[in-house]
From Swiss-Prot:
Keywords: Membrane, Transmembrane, Transmembrane helix. This is Protein Ric1. One of its GO terms (cellular component) is membrane. The chain crosses the membrane at residues 8-28, 34-54. It is a multi-pass membrane protein.
Amino acid sequence: MPITCGDIPRLICSVIIPPVGVFFQVGCTKDLAINCLLTVLGYIPGVIHAVYILIKE
């Protein structure tokens, strides 16, 4: 699925605060919990996971 103009704000949120971008994309799901854990363990893994979720959806 190509990235649209509506994805740009989510992508920016995902780079600044990864769980926020994931929450906007999928809501309160296991992906959000995984992203919160990855962000706490290391910022870069959280960003990578958030971008993956945005591109996957």
